[in-house]
Amino acid sequence: MTMAFMSVDEQMKILMRGVVDLVSEEELRQKLERSVKTGRPLRVKLGIDPTGKDLTLGHTVPLRKLRDFVECGHQGVLIIGDYTAMVGDPTGRNEARPQLTHAETTANAQRYLEQAARVLDVSKLEIRRNSEWLAPMSFSDVIRLAAKSTVARMLEREDFKKRYEEGRPIFIHEFFYPLMQGTDSVAVQADVELGGTDQKFNLLAGRDLQRDAGQEPQVCLMTPIVEGLDGVQKMSKSLGNYIGLDHTPDEMFGRTMSIPDSLIITYFTYFTDVPQEEIERIEAAMAAGENPMTFKKQLGRAIITTYGGTEEEARLAEERWVAQFSRGEVPEDIPDVVLPAAELPMQAARVLFTAGLAPSLSEARRLIEQGGFTVDGEKVTDPRAELALRPGQVLKAGKRKYGRVVLK
């Protein structure tokens, strides 16, 4: 297939937005120049392991970059890691991931694709499952693959190195993960592979295996791991600091309002379709002293419309939030209250006491029983109710005490 492309400089401007690491820019430009000259689209690979059913905004960052390549005329190749998911990516883990069955990964993959369709046109993608080439491998094939790397090389990975130094188990099958991901690149003859910065080791393994197979090494293009609502840890469902693609417009808007001001520009850049020029204007306005809340509300609306909501739904979500929080019901400058994430869920009375919103457990129980405790405006009446709080939620004790949840 041949086609006309926009100029290399025009493509680079689009493709480099939000990129934080690249191996290498020179190679990407060379591949684009050859693509323009020959009319052959680059094959741009993104692999996802369907280890869960629902996507957060954090998952959309590499998906949005894949969309950029597709809109520049290139062939997006989405690898459903139904086989690698049964191993579990050890990246950033202090312990081995639980292994999933093939039935579980198949069901998760279907849900993933349904949600990914909110980010890009999946009908334009070449969708492959790595069980196509990994499942038929014989044991001798696996041994030959294992011979492509060394234990010393694997221990260069920070997560493996840390576990080794702490005496935590590292299972042999975990060493295979980067080799399996690299084999995917060989199988689909990837020109470019996308991933988060935490995937660099795995992406580079693909380059090594492609060289060994006589292929031109892929360019490795990495996007950031964006912080969640707490502004500290990466966005994660397990931490509760996330905005999900399956959230309602009201939930999306409300959660956006809970982010620290320092994340406003980051979220505009990586999670919305707002033009870069407008983002720069917003950044300059905040630097000049304009109220960040104005732009946080704009961000909330933009997130809703970017992921399938209508302008009307975004407007109504803002109106409902304003009615609850801004018209004298809740102050905008709510102090943070720190709660230990490891102790959640926590009984309501202990939440009040630990957050410093009640002087004692007995006073906390009395306040709750009298109807004086709310979480995001919803009354809690049982002092023993187990609360699985998330970052950004607003606690109110009595008439005037407020706290915004931060988990540590």
UniProtKB/Swiss-Prot annotation:
Q: What class of enzyme is it?
A: ligase
Q: Per the UniProt entry, what is one GO biological process? A: tyrosyl-tRNA aminoacylation
GO MF terms on file? ATP binding; RNA binding; tyrosine-tRNA ligase activity
Q: What's a Pfam family this protein contains? A: S4
Cite the entry's keywords alphabetically: Aminoacyl-tRNA synthetase, ATP-binding, Cytoplasm, Ligase, Nucleotide-binding, Protein biosynthesis, RNA-binding
One GO CC term of this entry?
cytosol
Q: Motif location ('HIGH' region)?
A: 50-59
Where does the S4 RNA-binding domain start and stop, copy by copy?
A: 346-407
Q: What does this protein do?
A: Catalyzes the attachment of tyrosine to tRNA(Tyr) in a two-step reaction: tyrosine is first activated by ATP to form Tyr-AMP and then transferred to the acceptor end of tRNA(Tyr).
- What protein does this entry describe? Tyrosine--tRNA ligase
Q: Which organism is it from?
A: Symbiobacterium thermophilum (strain DSM 24528 / JCM 14929 / IAM 14863 / T)
What gene name does this entry carry? tyrS
